[in-house]
Amino acid sequence: VGFKAGVKDYKLTYYTPDYETKDTDILAAFRVTPQPGVPPEEAGAAVAAESSTGTWTTVWTDGLTSLDRYKGRCYHIEPVAGEENQFIAYVAYPLDLFEEGSVTNMFTSIVGNVFGFKALRALRLEDLRIPPAYVKTFQGPPHGIQVERDKLNKYGRPLLGCTIKPKLGLSAKNYGRAVYECLRGGLDFTKDDENVNSQPFMRWRDRFLFCAEALYKAQAETGEIKGHYLNATAGTCEEMIKRAVFARELGVPIVMHDYLTGGFTANTSLAHYCRDNGLLLHIHRAMHAVIDRQKNHGIHFRVLAKALRMSGGDHIHSGTVVGKLEGEREITLGFVDLLRDDFIEKDRSRGIYFTQDWVSLPGVLPVASGGIHVWHMPALTEIFGDDSVLQFGGGTLGHPWGNAPGAVANRVALEACVQARNEGRDLAREGNEIIREASKWSPELAAACEVWKEIKFEFEAMDTL
């Protein structure tokens, strides 16, 4: 027959330490924890094999293709500092293994069956280098940062948002009322909670109508362009597009999608619809912590963020560094840059394993949301800079005088921080002082400062290098 049947070590075929990576290869950095007795080279090679062309035994049909052309290769392995039995395995995948413009297909290969592999105790995808040749097959974000600013006519400051709470249980009319109060008070955006879809207490069409009414009323009063993220996420792609179409017919500026629970295929379809029809697209990352929170297994959020930029979204939630949800500062800033910038240098101190060139794919605005309030404003302004959306749910609606004064307090705090920064003051050191000064002439801000002066969410971050 002319082929050698039987099982042979993966490392004989898939571990190639002298391989020179190509500009068109997709490169992956995996954190591998092998089972006791499995050498790291074999574990790394097994990952490369099982996520590309390999299977557990030699097969006759191997002779009908060119393994050299199509196989994934583990080209470098390094131990993880401070961990006994963990290694970073670098794998290069030939471009031809992937369907153009499909995040779904890319993930099915790279993070598919290989994560259940018995020879590994745990496996985590830490980073991906997407080559320009592959980036160019994606539309990416429907509009991007600059186009969004032009649509909204807002420059030189972060944008302000608020998630409407209680997240479930309000009727459509009361929901619209809450939206109106927040927007009238000075916020740029309000947001459907990620789990608001179309439930018995509030069907989607009613919510869309009342929110649109609130939006137009607030715009007329304030003379500013306003938005409400209408969550189009649904049980089927057809229903999702139907909701997006209705949003477009109402003339609203932005819709929203839960990209992990909704899935990459649905998300990419919606992103294409949004670009074709002039809608901005806000992305919520519900379910991300299931995938990214374990340090030794899963997928790091920076990879999910890159995947979203390819699939398409104009905003994505990315942690706060200071609020109630997970996020270590340098690492968060690393993937915030991956979302916004066109070219990002490799920087291991921020968890960035590869240089990434997005070749003019539009950028995504990071959204800081979760347990933040007016006292955090100086830190948020400093950490995230102008190109971001700062979202205060409880930090707006929890104001003792109601939603509109809560919105006023946040807007005053933000404008004070931006002004102080532009005057050259140090927000990190003088932040509290800046907020106190501003609260002297804003009773709304003074009341907010009083309510939240003692609140802290301080735990050790899990997401360390």
Swiss-Prot record:
GO terms for biological process: photorespiration; reductive pentose-phosphate cycle. The record marks 324 as: Transition state stabilizer. The disulfide bond which can form in the large chain dimeric partners within the hexadecamer appears to be associated with oxidative stress and protein turnover. Its main location: plastid. The modification N6,N6,N6-trimethyllysine is found at residue 4. RuBisCO catalyzes two reactions: the carboxylation of D-ribulose 1,5-bisphosphate, the primary event in carbon dioxide fixation, as well as the oxidative fragmentation of the pentose substrate in the photorespiration process. Both reactions occur simultaneously and in competition at the same active site. Belongs to the RuBisCO large chain family. Type I subfamily. This is Ribulose bisphosphate carboxylase large chain.
